[in-house]
Amino acid sequence: MEICTKGSRKHLTSRASEPSYNVPENQYVLYVVSSTLSIVKQLVKVAESKKSRFSGAIEKLNERLDSLKDYRIINRDLVVKDLERLKKRFDTEVINAELSEQLAKINVNLSRSYSEKGYLRLEKATGSENEWWAKIKPSQNDDWQQFEPDGYTIFSSRDHYASLFKSYSDYEIEAKIPLPLRRGKAVVLYPEYISRICVLPESRSIQREQENFTKLRDKGIALSKKDWQAKLTTDELAEQEKERATINKRLGYFATEHEKVGIVHKALEPKLKPFQQIEKEWRQCKVKSKSTFPNSMTFVQNPAYQAVHSGFKKLKEQIGLADEDILLSLEKIEAIGLVNMPLLYERWCLLQIIKVLTQAFRYQPEDNWKRKLIANIQGNEEQISIQFFNPSVSRAITLQYEPFLANGKRPDFVLDVEAITKSGNQISKRLVVDAKYYSAAYLKQRGGIGGVIHELYNGKDYSECQENSVFVLHPVLDAVEKVVSPQEWAKDSYLGELSMFDWEPAHHQRQATNYGAVCANPMKSQRYLDEIQRMLGMFLQYGIEDNTSFRGASDDTHAVNFCVSCGSEKVVDVTKSMSSNNQKRWYRCNECTHFTVYTHCGTCNTRLIKNGEYWTYLSLMPMSSINIKCPNCESPV
């Protein structure tokens, strides 16, 4: 065999010849053509995906816009549930039975002491923990009085008896109360031992609950005559206008982005056929692709070859493809495919979490996160950990896939959040998420969402002794059997906003908003991303804070504020123009105009956050789109 490299038959000594184009220069050119075709294919796919995402977002926002009416349909079942709950709140037999049960549990660890009977009236809290302004009387027929005629009386329950007492309540009490302490003009009474306690029907708190019940019942009767359709109040219409402004702002943003990506798609899509044709022709010439750069004089001196090399280099720089093996790995994964549906759902959920963190909440992932994902899918790496940063809101997140907890359990995802507060302190909090690819029938067999949550939170102790928040991702529509909130998402998802399950302790003792189940179903159009965004937004805004028994000078959060609607850190305090309340805080997002209200429960002082009807993760009142229920004591706010 004779090989001629000059490219002309006249240089051959033999009569027969067969031309070959499979030379290093052409092998490299074919590699460039094939790689460019792959890149263009991926870019076209990305453009199509973004077009679809922006179209879906526009469709979803238009649906929300169309749903804004000057009336709302009231959920009758939730009104009935509220009436049943309110009835128990002024039923002194029920209340006193609960008090007796609580007292027995407290006294197990205390030495029994001689007790005397008396009457105690609690008024508003003093501001100190477990203390109230008070009055007393020795017998039922006496008048209420101060302990000393010219002074004030304070009652301090101390920590162990705190759960028995409530502001604006009158009690008949048998207790051992030692000599009082003095604090200026005030006398401080505190029980050393309580042997019996019962609330009196004439208590202002009981009367108020009875009035609330009567008002709600009368409203319910009136609504039943109007097919449960209620006109919005002036305040509700004002809130709706704010939401409409936010939606229109987001519509404008997504319409602009959709137009931009449409231009990119229109420019790239026609490039596919020419590259496919060139690749086909080169392969017909029996040229084999090779990525090795041919450092030959032919390649260096030929401007056509040089143009191919420099053009490919510029293309990679333009799209940020520093490592070509990522592109090759993606092609291999595409060829392999995934047929294990639970595993596919699990990894799909992982990608949705990443998508919400990066696209909705604007976190920046570490540089090599794609390589880590690819290594996991290819089976080269089981556990992966990806860092996400958002310095604008002083938060960092470590997302782990299939990690081991300290107790040896292995959930699907763990998100460790580190936040720096406005005063420079650090907050550390963990969210554990497990993806369950269950059918509706199988979910029911497992005890519904309550059974699955209980198994993970308590049984497997994903909560690590109630230190972590634990949520389940599932694809089942209408998974919530006993809906407790009137929001649209409450049929499919449960965010721990109110007590729901038999295994939960009394509402004031449970870990509110620390566990739940969220519907992540791709068949829900773009709404499934909102479900995940609402869950993660709740954790990043509310879950990392200590919200219980909040008595701060302001209802604001310690961590840096951000917008749960668009993820922007450009939120401004507009409290002075919205409210004269010294504790309450109003924030408006400068990018999407979304309003966030920081307030607290008047009954138990739990901090509460309202994010408008659509994004609020706490339960709204059945007959109001602006008033919510406290997740801790379940009182209306």
Curated annotation (Swiss-Prot):
Keyword Signal: no
Pfam family, one: PDDEXK_7
Function text: Catalyzes the hydrolysis of pyrethroids pesticides. Hydrolyzes cis-permethrin at approximately equal rate to trans-permethrin.
pH dependence per the UniProt record: Optimum pH is 7.0.
MF annotations from Gene Ontology: trans-permethrin hydrolase activity
Keywords attached to this entry: Hydrolase, Serine esterase
Protein name: Pyrethroid hydrolase
EC number(s) stated in the UniProt entry for this protein: 3.1.1.88
Regulation acting on activity, per entry: Inhibited by Hg(2+), Ag(+) and rho-chloromercuribenzoate.
Catalytic activity from the UniProt record: (-)-trans-permethrin + H2O = (3-phenoxyphenyl)methanol + (1S,3R)-3-(2,2-dichlorovinyl)-2,2-dimethylcyclopropanecarboxylate + H(+)
UniProt organism field: Klebsiella sp
